[in-house]
């Protein structure tokens, strides 16, 4: 994977985090995973978590919930909510982030051109997650967990 160098990356991350936090509404307090993420932990810290600390967030979550039942309604509702929030963010916020990054080539293959949006400012870009959003839904919105890439990587 090619290294992405951008002198404004921390400011871009802050802007992204601020935009995501504004969208945080209608949280179900009766879901223990959402309650942990939004009330016990600082959600902003997870969204803006630097790459070197993502594994620490995973360890914290696993320590808080050592015996997750991945078939239980609580977990399924949490996963559905977080992936839904990611899709909303992808459609509404990520265009500006991509525009700020000035990234034109897939960081995986360094050959395919990647585009942020179509003419209607709708995000057409593909994103991969370093830590899978299906296994780690609490990292689905983490700025440094998102990898802007070409469609070949996704498929």
Predicted regions and their residues:
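The −1 position to Zn-ligating cysteines in a subset of zinc-ribbon hairpins
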Residues: 105, 126, 149
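Histidine-centered nuclease catalytic patch
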Residues: 111-145
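A broad, low-specificity signal for short, low-complexity segments enriched in glycine/proline
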Residues: 69, 105-110
